[in-house]
Amino acid sequence: MALWGGRFSQAADQRFKSFNDSLRFDYRLTEQDIVGSVAWSRALVTVGVLSETEQQQLEDALNVTLEEVRTAPEAILASDAEDIHSWVEQCLIDKVGDLGKKLHTGRSRNDQVATDLKLWCRAQVTELLGAIHLLQQALVMTAEAHQDVVMPGYTHLQRAQPITFAHWCLAYSEMLARDESRLRDTLTRLDVSPLGAGALAGTAYAIDRDKLAGWLGFASATRNSLDSVSDRDHVLELLSYAAIGMVHLSRFAEDLIFFNTGEAGFIELSDRVTSGSSLMPQKKNPDALELIRGKCGRVQGALTGMMMTLKGLPLAYNKDMQEDKEGLFDALDTWLDCLHMAALVLDGIQLKSPRCREAAQQGYANATELADYLVARGIPFREAHHIVGEAVVEAIRQGVPLETLPLARLQAFSPVIDEDVYPVLALASCLAQRKAKGGVAPEQIAQAIAEAKQRLA
């Protein structure tokens, strides 16, 4: 049964009905719709629309419906109901008869769906926070296990300065911490209930909306009924945060894909997260990571799509807003899946420490140390930078590491260079000198790991 048939003399064309119906995706709001309906039935008691006996009948029937859905969710999609609100109402009428027709008194699908979606978003944020927490833990545990694995750090995909694999892991842990912070921040704005806003002008019944909000676990009710049903900021926020989070995971995936190449050879991925080739027997492809990288695009697309949907809408509900759900559901599902997959990839990763160290000693990654050495002896940094550049050119010409150039040759570039330069150019020294907060010095890495573990405990 449609919820709006009285105005029409002709039935909807089946092609339009298929185009218009949303049950195939908004069925995911079933639990939220039922929970919201229970709260609304209680509110109707306070204004005399329902007796307490009637309300209890409705609540019992709604709870039975919820249990039925949990047992056999496929029953929803077998229905020809227009949307989840229609489906729940019809289930109620089937169970309690005409009493079920009283539930929608004073309520619009406009405030109903806005409430359902906020309730769903809150639950999804909680699940995402859990997945982010688990991935952060995996990164910190991996960092702790590989504090001594030295590898090259890159800028412009060229070797730049030595770092450790632990430092790399902790960098992504920091990104995830920002993702977590953003999600926690949006919970504040999700904590306001639109239920009772009606179609756009508010409800004609003297319902205490703040009390109603409290029954649903919200901190308060919205202040303006027109904004309440027009607002999809929370959808845009979550899509934005998902887009940012997926960019982080895409960069994580790209780094590991590169580290896994034969050209880099820093890591070995587990067989559990790789696949082979149908033609080339030797192949072991990083499919899990490539899919994480690829799925980033679909999440960015969902954000762009929703922004374009909302940008020209007049206030109050428009059917365009039905398009808010599929992209949101898919984007947050994708983000959640990728968070879990990233943790699985880390779980089986193997570091090739000798190769990492070898690469860190190549590419003149200790050149900055020589510049700092000169600065410590009174040479202005810009001049020191130029001197070291000349020394690097000479080392390249000879095909040798910077630290193997004879002292006499180094002194030709600057007479202040002495024998004590060679320990400075050693790999261990390159790390040890970076002891300011956030640097790669061993004591800083150990402290960062300890602090991260404390935050995640």
Swiss-Prot record:
Principal location: cytoplasm
* InterPro entries per the UniProt record, alphabetical: Arg_succ_lyase_C, Argininosuccinate_lyase, Fumarase/histidase_N, Fumarate_lyase_CS, Fumarate_lyase_fam, Fumarate_lyase_N, L-Aspartase-like
Keyword Lyase included in the entry's annotation:
yes
Q: Which reaction does it catalyse?
A: 2-(N(omega)-L-arginino)succinate = fumarate + L-arginine
Specify one Pfam family.
ASL_C2
A biological process from GO: arginine biosynthetic process via ornithine
Which organism is the protein's source?
Answer: Sodalis glossinidius (strain morsitans)
Tell me what this protein is called: Argininosuccinate lyase
Pathway noted in the entry: Amino-acid biosynthesis; L-arginine biosynthesis; L-arginine from L-ornithine and carbamoyl phosphate: step 3/3
The EC designation for this entry is 4.3.2.1
